[in-house]
Swiss-Prot record:
Its cofactor is (R)-lipoate. This is Glycine cleavage system H protein. Residues 24-106 form the Lipoyl-binding domain. GO terms for cellular component: cytosol; glycine cleavage complex. The modification N6-lipoyllysine is found at residue 65. It holds the Pfam family GCV_H. Keywords: Lipoyl. PANTHER family: GLYCINE CLEAVAGE SYSTEM H PROTEIN, GLYCINE CLEAVAGE SYSTEM H PROTEIN-RELATED. NCBIfam families: gcvH, PRK01202.1. InterPro entries: Biotin_lipoyl, GCV_H, GCV_H/Fam206, GCV_H_sub, Single_hybrid_motif. It comes from Mycolicibacterium vanbaalenii (strain DSM 7251 / JCM 13017 / BCRC 16820 / KCTC 9966 / NRRL B-24157 / PYR-1) (Mycobacterium vanbaalenii).
Amino acid sequence: MSEIPADLSYTTEHEWVQRTGDGTVRVGITDYAQSALGDVVFVQLPDVGSDVTAGESFGEVESTKSVSDLYAPVTAKVIAVNGDLEGNPQLVNSDPYGEGWLVELQTETESMQAGLASLLDAEGYRAHVAD
Protein backbone atom coordinates (compact mmCIF):
# COMPACT_ATOMS: atom_id res chain seq x y z
CA MET A 1 0.00 0.00 0.00
CA SER A 2 1.21 3.49 -0.82
CA GLU A 3 2.26 5.87 1.92
CA ILE A 4 -0.50 8.43 2.68
CA PRO A 5 0.59 10.84 5.46
CA ALA A 6 -2.30 11.88 7.72
CA ASP A 7 -1.15 15.51 8.04
CA LEU A 8 -1.57 16.37 4.34
CA SER A 9 -4.54 17.16 2.10
CA TYR A 10 -5.00 15.48 -1.29
CA THR A 11 -6.58 16.05 -4.69
CA THR A 12 -8.36 13.42 -6.76
CA GLU A 13 -5.59 14.00 -9.34
CA HIS A 14 -2.99 12.61 -6.87
CA GLU A 15 -1.34 15.82 -5.67
CA TRP A 16 -0.66 16.37 -1.98
CA VAL A 17 -0.96 19.76 -0.28
CA GLN A 18 0.81 20.84 2.90
CA ARG A 19 -0.10 24.11 4.58
CA THR A 20 3.13 26.01 5.30
CA GLY A 21 1.70 29.35 6.46
CA ASP A 22 -1.51 31.39 6.61
CA GLY A 23 -1.78 31.79 2.86
CA THR A 24 0.90 29.38 1.63
CA VAL A 25 1.06 25.70 0.71
CA ARG A 26 3.64 23.29 -0.66
CA VAL A 27 2.47 20.86 -3.38
CA GLY A 28 3.81 17.56 -4.69
CA ILE A 29 2.58 14.28 -6.13
CA THR A 30 1.63 11.36 -3.94
CA ASP A 31 3.51 8.13 -3.38
CA TYR A 32 0.68 6.38 -5.24
CA ALA A 33 1.17 8.67 -8.26
CA GLN A 34 4.96 8.32 -8.40
CA SER A 35 4.63 4.55 -8.11
CA ALA A 36 2.13 4.44 -10.99
CA LEU A 37 4.32 6.71 -13.13
CA GLY A 38 7.52 4.73 -12.69
CA ASP A 39 10.94 6.36 -12.97
CA VAL A 40 10.54 10.13 -13.29
CA VAL A 41 12.95 11.58 -15.86
CA PHE A 42 11.74 15.20 -16.22
CA VAL A 43 9.51 17.66 -14.36
CA GLN A 44 8.13 20.79 -16.05
CA LEU A 45 7.09 23.45 -13.54
CA PRO A 46 5.74 27.01 -13.89
CA ASP A 47 7.90 30.08 -13.33
CA VAL A 48 7.93 31.81 -9.95
CA GLY A 49 5.38 34.62 -10.11
CA SER A 50 3.02 32.67 -12.39
CA ASP A 51 -0.65 32.39 -11.49
CA VAL A 52 -2.24 28.94 -11.33
CA THR A 53 -5.95 28.11 -11.31
CA ALA A 54 -7.52 25.39 -9.18
CA GLY A 55 -8.19 22.28 -11.26
CA GLU A 56 -6.12 23.44 -14.23
CA SER A 57 -2.79 22.03 -15.40
CA PHE A 58 0.32 23.89 -14.21
CA GLY A 59 3.04 21.51 -15.37
CA GLU A 60 3.98 17.95 -16.27
CA VAL A 61 5.82 14.97 -14.87
CA GLU A 62 7.49 12.79 -17.49
CA SER A 63 8.44 9.22 -16.65
CA THR A 64 9.77 6.27 -18.57
CA LYS A 65 6.12 5.13 -18.91
CA SER A 66 4.16 8.31 -19.67
CA VAL A 67 3.68 12.06 -19.34
CA SER A 68 1.15 13.24 -16.74
CA ASP A 69 -0.26 16.71 -16.15
CA LEU A 70 0.03 18.36 -12.75
CA TYR A 71 -3.13 20.12 -11.52
CA ALA A 72 -3.29 23.11 -9.20
CA PRO A 73 -5.08 22.30 -5.94
CA VAL A 74 -5.97 25.97 -5.33
CA THR A 75 -5.97 29.23 -7.29
CA ALA A 76 -2.79 31.01 -6.27
CA LYS A 77 0.56 32.53 -7.25
CA VAL A 78 3.71 30.39 -7.53
CA ILE A 79 6.21 31.68 -4.94
CA ALA A 80 8.80 28.89 -5.22
CA VAL A 81 9.66 25.91 -7.40
CA ASN A 82 11.87 22.99 -6.44
CA GLY A 83 14.99 23.74 -8.48
CA ASP A 84 16.59 20.48 -7.33
CA LEU A 85 14.24 18.58 -9.64
CA GLU A 86 15.88 20.05 -12.75
CA GLY A 87 19.03 18.01 -12.24
CA ASN A 88 17.55 15.31 -10.04
CA PRO A 89 13.92 14.58 -11.10
CA GLN A 90 14.04 11.14 -9.47
CA LEU A 91 13.59 12.89 -6.09
CA VAL A 92 9.88 12.70 -6.97
CA ASN A 93 10.22 8.90 -6.75
CA SER A 94 12.60 8.59 -3.82
CA ASP A 95 11.02 11.21 -1.51
CA PRO A 96 7.63 12.35 -2.89
CA TYR A 97 6.55 13.99 0.39
CA GLY A 98 9.92 15.61 1.18
CA GLU A 99 12.76 16.49 -1.19
CA GLY A 100 10.53 15.70 -4.19
CA TRP A 101 8.07 18.58 -3.59
CA LEU A 102 7.11 20.57 -6.70
CA VAL A 103 5.91 24.13 -6.00
CA GLU A 104 4.93 26.50 -3.22
CA LEU A 105 1.81 28.59 -3.73
CA GLN A 106 0.47 31.72 -2.05
CA THR A 107 -2.97 33.29 -1.99
CA GLU A 108 -5.14 35.22 0.44
CA THR A 109 -5.87 33.29 3.62
CA GLU A 110 -9.64 33.14 3.01
CA SER A 111 -9.16 31.81 -0.52
CA MET A 112 -6.65 29.27 0.76
CA GLN A 113 -9.00 28.04 3.47
CA ALA A 114 -11.84 27.64 0.97
CA GLY A 115 -9.56 25.81 -1.46
CA LEU A 116 -8.19 23.49 1.20
CA ALA A 117 -11.68 22.71 2.48
CA SER A 118 -12.52 21.15 -0.90
CA LEU A 119 -9.60 18.68 -0.74
CA LEU A 120 -9.54 15.11 0.56
CA ASP A 121 -8.06 14.12 3.90
CA ALA A 122 -5.85 11.02 4.17
CA GLU A 123 -8.81 8.66 4.68
CA GLY A 124 -10.69 10.19 1.76
CA TYR A 125 -7.66 9.85 -0.49
CA ARG A 126 -7.07 6.26 0.65
CA ALA A 127 -10.68 5.45 -0.33
CA HIS A 128 -10.18 7.25 -3.67
CA VAL A 129 -7.13 5.18 -4.66
CA ALA A 130 -8.76 1.96 -3.45
CA ASP A 131 -11.59 2.35 -6.00
